[in-house]
Amino acid sequence: ITHVSADGADWISVVVAERIPDAILCADAFHVVQWATAALDQVRIQAWRDARAAARSEPKRGRGAPRKDAPPRPASTLARGIQRSRYALWKNPEDLTDRQHAKLAWIAKTDPRLHRAYLLKEGLRTIFQLPYDDAVEALDLWLGWARRCRIPAFTKLARSVKKFRDVILNAIA
């Protein structure tokens, strides 16, 4: 056994070092992207909660269907749109449908923070598709971007990725 692919659990590195000391530990690309997807989902849920709170502060309508001349409720529309954006944010860009592309374009216009979180997730995902030398540079650039992004879920993710940087790069090599 020359390589061991695993997630970032600390106990795995201890067992591998103990049982197979010459093996190279590699971070499974799926799990690293899963960390980014979980961080993105935290940002999406917080954006939805913020939009829902704004929607609750809008004036209430009466019973029944709204009148044709009723004022629009933009915060309610925003909350509903963010709530229904989960799959568009999770999928790989090459697998998106036309409606999901439109949803991402809408997110880019209405919630820049959520869109930035999506771009961070996709940036980390693309690192695994690069040649090793390019991946080293791209990972360092991504770490800098994630540390400075002012999105708590991604600054926390940046600390985890930095901790497992060598293991992640072993998977690319």
Name each region found by the language model:
Residues 2-21, 30-33, 53-173:
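Acidic/histidine-rich catalytic cores and adjacent linkers
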Residues 24-26:
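Conserved beta-strand segments of alpha/beta enzyme cores
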Residues 29-53:
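Short alpha-helix plus adjacent loop in nuclease-associated cores
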